[in-house]
Structures are given as structure tokens and as C-alpha cells.
């Protein structure tokens, strides 16, 4: 009889625990897309977007207060009165502030290939400058912080060479790319609007400073019969 009683008890416990199994499921793609294209600046915004009543990870303040009052009441009845010891205050934990997608000042190191790709015996001054670039993170990894409007400006830098045992200085123009506006777009979408021309430009062509000529076909040389 005892064995059957234990089996019955285990079956009842399993019936209560079984609904909790399998609660964790894969996040729907629809939810990921909604998070990616929504403006979220705080945990409260995320809570409202997900339509969640409460945030997990902490105890309800009212329940904690009632429990502490009951504990103090029983403690005062059983334990004799002692000197009051100053209690340490709990450190308040601040909410994380997202690094939103926007333009920020970054340090751009001028590449030597942009000054003179044929030589290596020279110095650049200044070696780096400040530019505005799109930085920050988006709500999900499916989108990326990218520039939607850019601007180009030229600056003068000094190229120092050592010719015939004497330093030689030459001013060289360097074209810098600056970002004016940013947006969270898909990683595959890397085109943006240029402020000066109004055309869509590929970032790879802007960084190298080289443009491809289109509409010209190379003529093949005809071989003369021997």
C-alpha cells in the first residue's frame, strides 16, 4: 500500500509541474521586427511595447514591506532590546541608457595610401583628425546604424619627406567623409544619399576616393598576321 501511495503522490506532483515545462519558446520573428522598428529609450518603453504588466527580477515592494513588518514584530517579541545599529543603505541601481544611433565625433586616422600609395618613406601631420560618424546600436541585430545623409569636405595635411638628407614638406588635400544623419537599416542596405551631389553612392567608392568609369569599352587590339 505504501508503494502505491508514493506512486499516486508522484503522479499528482508531475501533473502540477508539467504545465511549466516547455514554457520557454523561440522568439517570434514578428516580435523581433516590431522591436527593430520601434523607438525604445527605457525599460518602461520596452514593457509597454511588449504589453507586459510587470518586470521580472525584483520583488513586489508591498509584499516585501508586509513581510519585513511581520519579521520585525516577531523579532521584537522574542529577542531582547539591543542598541540600534545604523543599517547600510542599499545602493540604487540606475537603469541602463541605450547608446542610440546618431552622429558622434570619432577619431579618423588618415590612411597613408590616401596620401601617396607609391611611397612609404614619408610622414603625415596631423596623422589623425576628428570627424562625425554614425555610431550606436539598434534594438536588434537585424538592423545596423548606418548613415542616411553624408557630406564631404577637404582638409590640408602636411606630407614630410626626406630628400637628399634634407626634410621636404608638401601640402596634400585629403577628402573626409562626415555623416549628417543616421538611421537603423538592414545590414545589406549600405547605400546612402550624398549631400553634395544628391546621388546614391557606394561607401567602398567613397573611402578609396576612386570612381569607376562607365560607358567606355576597351577596344581589343587586332593582331597582324605574320
UniProtKB/Swiss-Prot annotation:
Cysteine disulfide links: 101-145, 134-182, 138-184
Any one Gene Ontology molecular-function term assigned to this protein's record: platelet-derived growth factor receptor binding
Location(s) in or outside the cell: Secreted
GO BP field: angiogenesis; platelet-derived growth factor receptor signaling pathway; positive regulation of cell division; positive regulation of cell migration; positive regulation of cell population proliferation; positive regulation of ERK1 and ERK2 cascade; positive regulation of phosphatidylinositol 3-kinase/protein kinase B signal transduction
Key words, A-Z: Cleavage on pair of basic residues, Developmental protein, Disulfide bond, Glycoprotein, Growth factor, Mitogen, Secreted, Signal
InterPro entries per the UniProt record, alphabetical: Cystine-knot_cytokine, PD_growth_factor_CS, PDGF/VEGF_dom, PDGF_N
CC terms in the record's Gene Ontology section: extracellular space; membrane
Chief location category: secreted
Domain statement: The long form contains a basic insert which acts as a cell retention signal.
Family named by the database record: Belongs to the PDGF/VEGF growth factor family.
Assembly information from the UniProt record: Homodimer; antiparallel disulfide-linked dimer. Heterodimer with PDGFB; antiparallel disulfide-linked dimer. The PDGFA homodimer interacts with PDGFRA homodimers, and with heterodimers formed by PDGFRA and PDGFRB. The heterodimer composed of PDGFA and PDGFB interacts with PDGFRA homodimers, and with heterodimers formed by PDGFRA and PDGFRB.
Record's function text: Growth factor that plays an essential role in the regulation of embryonic development, cell proliferation, cell migration, survival and chemotaxis. Potent mitogen for cells of mesenchymal origin. Signaling is modulated by the formation of heterodimers with PDGFB.
Name under which the protein is recorded: Platelet-derived growth factor subunit A
Organism field: Xenopus laevis (African clawed frog)
Amino acid at each position: 500500500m505504501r508503494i502505491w501511495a508514493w506512486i499516486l503522490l508522484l503522479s499528482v506532483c508531475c501533473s502540477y509541474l508539467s504545465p511549466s515545462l516547455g514554457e520557454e519558446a523561440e522568439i517570434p520573428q514578428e516580435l523581433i521586427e516590431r522591436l527593430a522598428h520601434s523607438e525604445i529609450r527605457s525599460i518602461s518603453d520596452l514593457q509597454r511595447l511588449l504589453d507586459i504588466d510587470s518586470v521580472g527580477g525584483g520583488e513586489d515592494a508591498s509584499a516585501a514591506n508586509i513581510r519585513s513588518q511581520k519579521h520585525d514584530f516577531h523579532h521584537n517579541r522574542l529577542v531582547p532590546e539591543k542598541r540600534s545599529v545604523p543599517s547600510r543603505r542599499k545602493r540604487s541601481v540606475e537603469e541602463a541608457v541605450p547608446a542610440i544611433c546618431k552622429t558622434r565625433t570619432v577619431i579618423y586616422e588618415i590612411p597613408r595610401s590616401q596620401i601617396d600609395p607609391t611611397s612609404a618613406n614619408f610622414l603625415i601631420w596631423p596623422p589623425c583628425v576628428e570627424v562625425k560618424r554614425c555610431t550606436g546600436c539598434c534594438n536588434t541585430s537585424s538592423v545596423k546604424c548606418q548613415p542616411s545623409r553624408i557630406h564631404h569636405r577637404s582638409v590640408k595635411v602636411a606630407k614630410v619627406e626626406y630628400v637628399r638628407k634634407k626634410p621636404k614638406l608638401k601640402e596634400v588635400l585629403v577628402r573626409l567623409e562626415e555623416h549628417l544623419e543616421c538611421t537603423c537599416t538592414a545590414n545589406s542596405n549600405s547605400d546612402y544619399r550624398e549631400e553634395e551631389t544628391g546621388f546614391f553612392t557606394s561607401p567602398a567608392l567613397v573611402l578609396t576616393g576612386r570612381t569607376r568609369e562607365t560607358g567606355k569599352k576597351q577596344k581589343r587590339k587586332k593582331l597582324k598576321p605574320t
